[in-house]
Amino acid sequence: MRHQCRVPQLGRPADQRKAMLRALTTQLIREGRVTTTKARAKALRDEAERMITLAKDGSLASRRRAIGYIYDKQLVHALFDKAPTRYGERKGGYTRITRTVPRRGDNAEMAIIELV
């Protein structure tokens, strides 16, 4: 039984869930906004904010952790260059989740997650 497990399952095995969140995080950092389901957006928020916090730190160890998570190495370098100036005094809350209309096919709750 999954009593008090805080990780959202998202209907996938662990390896597929991790790959999906890595891909969504990479796309969010590249594009600035992603349209996805509400549950995925909430799970994505934790990962994206963790990567931005690493970028604000700016150390070599933080850069290596981000390179190990984000699929595009050049995107990591760009994030580490612009994050300290863009989010310097902000302590958290780097993303915003906005609910949109339900998906037409299965009526799933949709949301737009974007970088603030």
Curated annotation (Swiss-Prot):
Coiled coil spans: none
GO BP term, example: translation
Keywords in alphabetical order: Ribonucleoprotein, Ribosomal protein
UniProt GO MF annotations: structural constituent of ribosome
Transmembrane regions: none
Pfam families the record matches: Ribosomal_L17
A GO CC annotation given for this chain: cytosolic large ribosomal subunit
Domain of life: Bacteria
UniProt family annotation: Belongs to the bacterial ribosomal protein bL17 family.
NCBIfam families membership: L17
Subunit and partners: Part of the 50S ribosomal subunit. Contacts protein L32.
Name this polypeptide is given: Large ribosomal subunit protein bL17
Designated gene of the protein: rplQ
